[in-house]
Amino acid sequence: MKALLVGDLSPTAKSNPLFAAKDIDGLFSKDAKKLFEGNDINFVNLEVALTDIENGIKKFGPCLKASGGTADVLKSLGVTVCGLSNNHIFDFGRQGVADTLSHLERVGLPYTGYGKNYEDSRKNYFVEKNGERVCLIAVCEHEYSYAEGDFEGSRPFDCYDTLEDIRSAKEEADCVIVLYHGGKEHCRYPSPRLVKTCRAMVKAGADLVLCQHTHIIGCYEQFGGGHILYGQGNFHFAGHSDKDGESWNQFLATLYDTETHEIEFLPMVNDGPKIKLAEGEEKEKILKGLRERSALGEEGWYEGFKNACHTDFAWYVKAIGYEGASEHDFHLLAHYLDCEAHHDILSELFKTAHQKKENY
């Protein structure tokens, strides 16, 4: 089968009126629309609640919502399945999700990566054609939206359950594609943990792992017979902010042949509230950057990740909770984060609003 897999879609203040008006031509260039033709699978990560609710949940970060017309646009565009495993689908609580699912069901658009409880969220999504079976697994890191126990939410990545889910899927399908929503935002390089995680998923049976969420194009590697893209960039987050630089406005559409396992990355760019395929020098510049970063390998990726972390040092120091923290305090915090048992204790003592079920 032929699959088109694209990243995060979230209408912005500039593009939402066009989504509400179902103005496909105002949102997608001709070449962008053509990408969706002739494929068996067209996947997009719907990173927004389609709702009119005013008040978002208690969280750090923005609450994203958009017009229900977004569902109509995606259906008309040719999207065949939406991924809902991300950190914004629950921004307006259960009612916001209910509204979103209602709009998707209204236009007949399937979704994956969300469930009425944790076990339900783990349902795999299969596509069958001419005797071939492909499985899509959409998972996210733990950031406000995830399912837990009997509570609804996105399908979270779990270092035990997800790998088992991939192994089970491989027994039932010819090809397994994992959409992993995670990684450090605005960083082109994967952390050592993310590299290990993605490689483990390939070892478990994934043929392709696409990391989304970071809003920026990262690095690529072939590993163990599989493909891993550490950072696909957005899909339609056009006009998010006038301050957004070049990195935010460039992204990759992924074309993948599930039988031959051939893969192609197609650079795309924002053009006001519209997106289009990159051409000429701009296209080559994007691909050249991807090749150069990918060639750095693990050591180079770690240096890039480490440098990005240090630029955010002051931000994370705030989490300690007081000014004048000493070197001893930093070492103590590092010890608590490093040791599994201490990490368990911290997680039990200090819970987010999501974990406390305050957003339900």
How should these model regions be labeled?
Residues N39-T51, I166-Y189:
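Short acidic, glycine-rich surface-loop motifs adjacent to enzyme active sites
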Residues T12-K14, L50-I53, N87-L101, Y118-K123, ...:
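Active-site environment of divalent metal-dependent phosphoester hydrolases
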Residues I53-K75, C175-D207:
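Active-site-proximal segments of metal-dependent phosphoesterases and phosphodiesterases across multiple
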